[in-house]
Amino acid sequence: MRFQSVISALFLLAALLSCGKEPDAEPASPELTVIIGTDGYGDGSYNDTMLEGILGFCKDHPEVNLTLQQPSSVADAGKRLDSWLAAEGSADRALILASNTYEDILRGKPAPKNGRVLILETDDVFPGHSSYIIRRYGASWLSGAMSRFFTGIIFKAMDGNDMIEESARGFSDGHSAASDNNVYTWTLADGPQGFAMRDSTYRFVYRKYQEFLTSGEYYGSLLFFPLLGGSLPGLFDYSRYNGFINIAGMDVDCTAYNPWVVPYSLCVNNHLVLKNYLEDWLAGTLWPEHQQFGLESEFIQVVPNTQYNFANQDMLALYRDFYSQAVEKEKAYEK
């Protein structure tokens, strides 16, 4: 009887040990969170190229859990960032702040306990986090020089954005070096809302163009160098009303909008940069604190429209004439 009691006790102990032992848990799937710009996606240009890179990466790596977040404001994005930084877990995590308008909400924030943060298109350094910028000066200088036969209008979404100001200066410097024509600057809004004002852009340009015509300053063919983000389609909408303007394509090749209006496009290939960063993340490679890319990289380029022939201008020939000089100007500018 005593023997049977001992055996029963051993069986009970074994059963308890068996129930308490769990099978080896599978590692948690990598988690990628993207806080997109407040102007959102669907602009057919800058933001959409970033989304292309992110979705392409996730298609190649289905094990990655992707979360896209659309904040209503920069303050809302700050709350989402704080929530992400405070979260804990075992998964390998990465957060992308997909707009340089989020610089202030990241500045001074500690590194996450697990995971990493990347903010796009900023010249600033954020200790504990990573950032990169695709320099615009060289490509914008080349664009300005290629626009030598036009009166230029630099059309900005807002003032004070470092990336926009660098682009504007590059275009102005390149145009001045190659042309005696004037360059003017228009500004759409007084803040980041200028990146998402398609309808207002149409009305703004209609009014400003009428003022421009009656000012006595305008002469020659007019070319817009747009730094508008998601507001750019509004300018192309206006070009269907006024066929006498020309528009530099921006962020992506815009020739398809109207090959007779777009002499060239300044293409920013953020999707290629992001793919490199995300592949390094999965491979366990640490991200640099900060990186810069310029005209000599594959990440920014000016694409001439070979169909464009207004006044017999050869965009490809102009590109070849000024490319090397633009590279040197960018190097000097960075010093």
Predicted segments — roles?
Residues 15-18:
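C-terminal motif of bacterial Sec signal peptides marking the signal peptidase cleavage site
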Residues 20-22:
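Bacterial signal peptide processing site
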Residues 33-53, 57, 61, 69-74, ...:
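Extracytoplasmic "Venus flytrap"
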Residues 34, 89-100, 120, 154, ...:
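Periplasmic-binding protein-like
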Residues 54, 141-188, 289-311:
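An alpha-beta-alpha
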Residues 110-135, 252-259:
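Flexible loop/hinge segments that line or gate small-molecule binding clefts
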Residues 131-153, 266-286:
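Hydrophobic alpha-helical segments within soluble ligand-binding/sensing domains
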Residues 279-335:
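Hinge/cleft segment of the Venus flytrap/periplasmic-binding protein
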